[in-house]
Each structure stands twice: as structure tokens, then as C-alpha cells.
Amino acid sequence: MLWLRRLFARNRPRNAHAVEVWQWNRIESLWADLCYAVRILSKSPGFTAVAVASLALAIGANTTIFSYANQVLFVRLGVPHPEQLRVFRLTGDDHIAVREIKGHDVYVSDDGHFRLGLFPYPAYQQLRHNNRVVEDIFAFMQPPDVDITAAGMSEVGKVEFVSGNFYTQMQVKPQLGRPIEAADDGTPGGGAVAVISDSFWHRDFGGTQDVIGKTIRVNLTPVTIIGVNPPNFSGPVAADTSAPEIFLPLSMLTTVFPDPTGILMAPNTLLLQLMARSKPSVSTAAAQASLDTSFNAAFRGTAIVNKGETVPRLSLEDGSRGITSGTRDLLQPLYIVLGLAGLVLLLACANIANLMLARASLRQREMSIRMALGAGKVRILRQVLTESLLLSAMGGAAGLVLGYTSRNLIPWLMRTAWDGGEMNVGFDWRVFGFTCAVTLITGIVFGIAPAWRSSRAEINTALKEGSQTSSKRRKAWSGKMIVGFQAALSTLLVISAIFFLRTLLNLNSVDPGFRTQHLLLLDVTPSPTLLDTASQVARLRSRVADAFATIPGVQEVTYANHSLGDANSDWRSPFQREGALQDLAADPKKTGHAYAMFSYVGPHFFSTMSIPILAGRGFNAQDTETAVPVSVVNQALVRKFFPNTNPIGKRFFGGYGTRLIVGVCADTRYSDMRQPTPPVHFDLDPQSPWPGQMTYIIRSPLRPAALVPSLRRAVQLIDPDLPLSNIRTQQ
């Protein structure tokens, strides 16, 4: 930028007094340029308003999108030295020795391997005991939503179970009270204490200082509040749409979620997420190698590894932003949207540059007179750039306000009209710096062409009569270049919009495999501590379904442990068809066990969802709790596990036990409309021990707003403490 250097370095004086005078004159000159720019722009209010509005919209859109991208991609955990944190992960193939996965931190990488962020509890204990290469390993897990009763009010919320060293290793101190300590996590069921979030403290207790020592109930289990987290601490996930409201000791897990079968603590069940702080003296590669060896020994020493099964490999990842698996699918769309927003900003700059060029041609005589009176080209250049920067500053200020007020727009657009959860997008120094940088660059970009044109005015020619036509001819090349640039950008944006619209139309035309119209979904979470047996859970669910079915306007009712098409539904378990163990013994490399998705569904599921049964039958009245456990499988599962074979009457092991296949249903989308249908088996819920949250699916032509009050009353008549939440439509 040689011209900028000349702008401030020309005729620089050499002695101290002259330097002081020169600096003061320079400030006066800049101030005069600014005042003149204000007067010039105020004389053209229409032009100024159009330019500022265009810049405000473009900069505001970029600020809004960058605010969301900053929250998802760059914001670190609100803990001291987050760069020291490491997240533990597992990598495995179809033959890993895992029986159950309790969580959603699972995906398939590009190389076809499973990437898991979950660990068995017994292996964690061994790994922590043998660790020498990182600071103390801490564990945590977020279970399904729970029923929280506080200050006499019942609600559905999220909790996080944490190990006794969680707060010590996170280096977080509560703003009130004390944290969860090792003594609270020593004995199963013995640490009935809780640390609550700052938002929960203010919402349910009004932010009063006497909250310490008060009792709340989590799934009807009383716990005593011992601390309140700092406002900037949301747990182990930085950009979470639903941060935990209550933190409990890990020892309380089987009390809040009774586990008579011992599945939660089973050595082959993936349950916990792990993190640790790195040691300065040990590299990440060396720590990973040592921990992988230790985990292999710990897993083989605690879990069951059959012939042909493999132990997953352990790896360490950056944990400064906490658990980021939930944002993995957002990366590519975010980068695309950021690029498109940048193109819109460039287009706005080109538009204003064209307007400025048009104004420059009309001001040729003015500039020529100023140059004839002694103004140098640098002074003219600086004056026009000052006007451009003033315009960009006004547009940037308006864009900053627009970006701040609409910073939560993207999360709001991503949630349904009935879903109350939302991400609180921060507005930190990165966003402010980004907006200031964009404003400065914008002013230079759209101002440099008019400034350069104005500084090259020919005095004699411009002062002659008719010089305006001549100047128009001489400026034509720059105007045509900008118009061409605008046309190119506009074409690119139009093509991008066409592709985007085509993608939306394609997604809208994808057949999900069931009828999505007139389906209302809502979640009901019974307390597992109140319902001691699976039969009690089944009876409660039947009562709720029967109550919903009697409401006028309701055509059919069913329920499932999650809704089809839910992006957060990733329920999978090992799948072994009947005879697979014999095949595995004969040739370990031939079969092994693969994974299949599964859903626990209620009676009338297939008729309510309008999913056709292609072979066999659906569920009927003979499929009681004491009858043989049955399942309906989809076509994708038949193609993978029963090729060229009739699956009806065959048995398989998956989910919570052995089941009999009684029917084959059509393929439906499971969790992603863009992905092929995975193998899925639908298990009858009354025959399963699943005690957690259920999604009720109601088919009705009535508007949701008209139906919801009746649904709430029906639930309250059964149990006033039974929470109803997350109301949304299937579409």
C-alpha cells in the first residue's frame, strides 16, 4: 500500500518542534476532511440512506452468521486454560466387543470406522487407576431428560452426572457453595447432592442467596443443593442448545435411574464420556499411545471379548471446546453460508462503488477547482476515502446493532415452533473485531475506485464547458469493470440460490416412508423411581395413550422412544442373527456382529405412522408382556442380515435380548433425510425394560394449538407431576 505510506509520510519534518506542529496540522486536516464529508453526505440524504441501508444489511447479515459460527466453531469452554483439555475417543470396526451404546456421541467416519465418544464404567476405573501420562481422568454423562421438581413446580430438564474429580480438573469454582467432590462420588446412592446452573438458580429460585441447603427432586429422588455454577460455565459442551441445569455425582446414576439388570455398569456397555488435562512434560502422541495400551488391557480385563471380536482403539482430541460431536454436521453448511454472506457483502460494495463513481463524475468540476486552488492529489484521494470510510462506519454501526439484535436468529430458525430450547449466542470480542474489520475493509473496497478516479482529474479539461461528457467517457472503463464484477457476483449468487432451492426441493420430495401430515409429537417422561417394574411403566404408557385416544379429534395414538426423522436419534446396538455364533466359531472373519438401529414402539405404531407391513404381521393383542418378545424389521435389515432368506420366524439378538421376527415393514428414513435407510428393528415396548422418556405420536387433523390444552389436561388427570414437553409436529 505505497499510496497509504505516502499519504502520511510526505513532507515529514525532521526537528521535534516541527514534528509537533506537523502532527497538529495533520489532525486538523483529518478533522476538516471528516467535517466536510459529513456536510457532503448530508446534502445527499437519499444516496446516504441507500448506501448505509445496503451496508447495514450486508454487514448485519455477516455479523449474525459469524456470531453463530463463532459460537459453534471457536468459543472455548468457560474454564481456566481450556487448551490443556483433551477429549477421549474410541475407534472401532463392525467387530468391536460392545453390547450396548448409551448415548449419541457415535458416528461413522469417512474411512468406514465407528467413532465413539463413550466408554464402559469398569474400563474407566481401571484406566484412571493406571494413568501416568495425563492429569486425573474425569468422567461425565448426560442421560435422557428427567423430571425436576423445584420450588413446588415440576418441569422437564437436563442433568449431568459427573465424577468426583470433575470440578477439580475443570478448575471451576461455584459462585455459591461448594462443588461436587470425591467424597460425594464414593458410595452408590450416597451423594444426594447437586450443583445447579446459574440460569436454573435465577429462574426457579429468583437468585436468592439462601438457595444452598434447599432440596429439589430429580425423578422424585431428593437431592440437596450445595453449589451454584458460574454464569459462564455450561458444562463440558461449549455450544450446546440445552446445557445441563443440574449436576449430580456419578454415584447417583443408578438411584435416579434404577437399573435392576445392571446394564448401566456392564463392562461391554459404552456409557461415559471422558476428558483430562494434558501434562506439560508429556506430548499428546506419547499420552495417546500409553493410554491406548492401558485401555486395551483394562477393557480385556473387565469386559467379555469373544473370538473374532476386537477392542476399540483409544485416541485423544483437542478438548478446548469440549464435546463437539454435536456440531460435526454443521461445519460444511456453516462454511457455505459464510462464503455466501461474504459474496453478498462484496456485491453491496460493488453497488455502492458504482454509486460513488457516478457521484465522482458529477463532482469532477468541484475536484478540479480544489486542485486548481492548491489541493494535491493525495489530499483529494484522502477526502474521497474519508467519505467512503464515514459511510462504511455508519453502515457498520447499524450492522453491528442489527447483528447483535439478530444473533439468536439462526438457532431460532433451526428449532420448531413448539420447542423451547435454544442456543444463547454470545457476542464477544471476536464478533466485534470481525465487524470492525469488515467495516474498514468495506470502506476501502468500495471507496478506492472513486477516490482514485477523483484524484486523477485533469484540471484544464474538467473546467472547460462540456467536460462532463468527456469525463464520463474516461471513467467508462472503471464503471464497466464494476458492473461486470456485479454481474459475475450476482450470477454466482443466483446459481448458489438455485442449487440451494433444488436441494430443498429434493429433500422435500424425499419419501420418508410414512405419512408426515397431521402428526403431533410430544414427550412424556415418567419417573423411573416411582415405577418399580417394567409392567408399571407399560401400564402408565397405555393409560396415557388411551387418555389421548379419547380426546375429540384424535384419530390414532402410539408412542416410541424417539420419533422417526429425529436428528438426535442414534439408537444402535450389536445385531446377531440366529446361528451367527456358530458361523463365527467356524470362521471368525466371516460374520462377527454388526450394528443395527432399533426403536421401542407401542401398539398401533405402524398404522398411526402409515408404514405398510410388507410381509408377516404387525403387533397384535397376543403380544403381551409375558409372550415371546417380537420385532418387526425393515427391508434394509433383511437385505443386510437375511439375504435371499425369509426372515419371518427367525430370531436375533439385539437391543435388550433375543426377539422373534414377526413382520417386515417398508423402509423409512431413520434420523437423516439425506442418508440411505439403515437396518432397523422395531421392538414392542411393553415387552422391553426401557424406563425412560417416550415420544407420543398423535394423528389428528386439528391444529396443534387447539389440541395441546386437552392433551395437558389428560396427562394431569393421570398424574399431576407427570411432565409433558417438547411439543412439535412431524413436519
Which residues does each predicted region cover?
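Alpha-helical transmembrane segments of integral membrane proteins
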Residues: 7, 11-49, 319-326, 355-382, ...
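N-terminal membrane-entry
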Residues: 326-343, 430-434
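Short, strongly hydrophobic transmembrane alpha-helices
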Residues: 45-72, 76, 81, 347-349, ...
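Membrane-proximal extracellular/periplasmic loop immediately following the first transmembrane helix
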Residues: 77-144, 268-273, 511-577
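A short glycine-centered flexible hinge/capping loop motif at secondary-structure junctions
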Residues: 58-60, 372-376, 395, 399, ...
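Conserved beta-strand->loop/alpha-helix structural units within folded catalytic cores of enzymes
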Residues: 43-58, 62-65, 215-218, 278, ...
